[in-house]
C-alpha cells in the first residue's frame, strides 16, 4: 500500500482559500478533499455535499458526542467538523487527503497526525482583505470589521504552519500550492514504497 499524505490548508475569511483549493484539486490527480459538516446556513450557490454537509445544531452536537469528528471548531458562532471515518478510509486506501479547515482544526489534526503538512494562505494586505470581504456583499460594515479583527487573530497563528502562501496573484498562488504538494509526494519515504519494485531491481546484485 502506498503511503498517503494528509494536507491542511487554512486561511482567514476572505483570503481566497476555497477558490485556491478548488483550482488545486482540479490540477492535481489522486487527491481527495474532505467535505466538512457545518451548522452555518447555506449561502447562494452552496451545494450540499460539495461545499459542505449542512446539518443543524442538534445533529452536530450528537456527532461530537459520538466521536464522529476528527476535528471540530467554532467560527463566527457556527460549528464546523471533519468526519473521522471518511478521512481514515481514504488514508488507509493510500489516497492523499486535503483538509480545508481553520487554524483551530489544523492544530487538532497535527496533534493526531504529526506528519500532516500544513499550509496557511495569507492576503497581500489588510486592505486587500477588506476589499474582498466588501465585494462578497454578504455582510454590513460592522460585520466586516469584526471579520477583519478575527482575521488578524487567525493570522497570528501563522507560525504553527509549515508553509505560507500569499494570495496576491491567484495563478501564482495555485502554482505555489502545486509545488508544495508535489515536493511532499517526492520525499524519499513516500517514493520508497511506491517504487519498491524498481528500487529492488536497481540495487539488487546479479
Swiss-Prot record:
Coiled coil start-end: none
Gene3D superfamilies with a match to the protein in the record: Guanylate Kinase phosphate binding domain, P-loop containing nucleotide triphosphate hydrolases
Protein keywords: ATP-binding, Cytoplasm, Kinase, Nucleotide-binding, Transferase
Principal subcellular localization: cytoplasm
Enzyme kind, highest EC tier: transferase
Residue ranges annotated for the Guanylate kinase-like domain, each copy included: 4-182
Gene Ontology cellular component terms for the protein in this record: cytosol
Catalysed reactions, as listed in the record: GMP + ATP = GDP + ADP
Transmembrane segments: none
Subcellular location: Cytoplasm
Residues the entry annotates as binding ATP: 11-18
Range of residues in the leader sequence: none
GO MF term list: ATP binding; guanylate kinase activity
Pfam families xref list: Guanylate_kin
Superkingdom, taxonomy of origin: Bacteria
Enzyme Commission code: 2.7.4.8
Family listed: Belongs to the guanylate kinase family.
Task performed by this protein: Essential for recycling GMP and indirectly, cGMP.
NCBIfam families noted in UniProt: guanyl_kin (TIGR03263)
Name by which UniProt lists this protein: Guanylate kinase
Organism of provenance: Coxiella burnetii (strain RSA 493 / Nine Mile phase I)
Name of the gene: gmk
